[in-house]
Amino acid sequence: MSRPLYLRTNEQEEAVRSLEWAETQAQLIANEPYHWKWVFIALHNAAQGFMVLALWNGNGLLTLRPKIATKWLTAYENGGPFPTEKLDEFLNLYAKVKDAGNFHTKGSGPFNGKHSHDLSLDKLNSIRNEFIHFTPKGWSLELAGLPGICLDVLELMQWLGQESTAILWYKPAHRVRAKRAIRRLMRTLQQLAKRCDA
């Protein structure tokens, strides 16, 4: 068997692998709390991926920043040139999956989360950004609330990927892997929450 020459991926593989990586990192937290960093980074990437999949609608325009989507449509109508595609901001994608106007098939949406989901997605985004754009400083992150934030995010992903028809999984294995990773990660986070409360 020859060695691969390329790393191949796509939007579904990215979302599922990021979710699986968050689950792998969460299992290490009991021995080393620093793994929370990698859970937040991977879970942010996975949640963003699931929202992108849910908003794809056959052309991906809803996933782009509004000005870019408008320029893309204009270029399409006029035969080009096409703009560089830029994914919309994380919290804008979240607002879009909560907007009924963005879903046109039965059972696809919108996500009707609770206020805690809004707070948790905002917190996930903030913490992830602190890690990704880390400035010179000392920083302490209280562990007690972290499992709850992640559980809320997983509820969004479970709804988008398993309970609604928003995501069209073109490989059944992606759906199965996502379901398994969500279930395992929820279990791990619930155990971590109990430890934080003890």
Q: Model-predicted segments: where are they?
A:
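Generic macromolecular interface patches on structured domains
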Residues: 32, 56-57, 131, 138-141, ...
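Short, structured coil/loop segments at alpha-helix boundaries
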Residues: 5, 12, 20, 111-121, ...
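A structural signal for well-ordered alpha-helices, especially hydrophobic packing surfaces
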Residues: 26, 47-54, 128, 132-135, ...
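General structural signal for secondary-structure boundaries
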Residues: 82, 86-93, 113-114, 139-146
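Amphipathic alpha-helical interface segments
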Residues: 2-108
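Histidine-centered, metal-coordinating catalytic motifs and their short helical/loop contexts
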Residues: 110-141
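Charged, amphipathic alpha-helical oligomerization/scaffolding segments
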Residues: 14, 21, 45, 96, ...
